[in-house]
């Protein structure tokens, strides 16, 4: 399980098939990965590590898009499938599958501007056995920074 939380964000329709959920990198308040039981570990995940993990391996999110739930501060929920992730120096953008993107609390989708959005990402990637892969992806993404030590819990 991954949890990505920001202080603000937006939903934009980008075509017949997709929406995008975007927020400024500066608005990111938490990005956390949890392992499955029995290990029950958790890790802070810097944006560059999340981006590196997106395409890493045969079971990557790029190869098998994850299910997700997006919640805004009013408690409304939207179920979606994440089909893309782009992180640059300014923003984090997830691509949402249109057919899966729907609100379960009302007839309308979440509003265009979101306050305190939280994205819950379902993942079989982060099992106890997958921790080594997480650390490898983190090491590659963080080679030039100190965030690798954070992945190790230092």
State the predicted function of each range.
Residues 1-74:
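Acidic, glycine-rich low-complexity segments with interspersed aromatic residues
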Residues 68, 80, 92-94:
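Hydrophobic residues positioned within well-ordered beta-strands of beta-sheet architectures
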């Amino acid at each position: 399980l991954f949890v990505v939380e920001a202080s603000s964000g937006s939903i934009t329709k980008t075509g017949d098939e997709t929406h995008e959920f975007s927020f400024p990198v500066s608005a990111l308040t938490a990005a956390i990965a949890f392992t499955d039981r029995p290990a029950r570990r958790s890790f802070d995940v810097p944006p560059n590590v999340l981006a590196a993990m997106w395409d890493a391996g045969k079971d990557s999110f790029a190869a098998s898009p994850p299910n997700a739930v997006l919640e805004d501060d009013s408690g409304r929920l939207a179920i979606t499938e994440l089909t893309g992730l782009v992180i640059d120096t300014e923003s984090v953008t997830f691509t949402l599958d249109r057919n899966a993107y729907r609100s379960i609390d009302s007839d309308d989708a979440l509003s265009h501007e979101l306050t305190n959005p939280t994205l819950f990402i379902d993942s079989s990637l982060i099992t106890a056995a997958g921790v080594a892969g997480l650390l490898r992806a983190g090491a590659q993404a963080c080679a030039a920074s100190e965030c690798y030590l954070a992945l190790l819990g230092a």
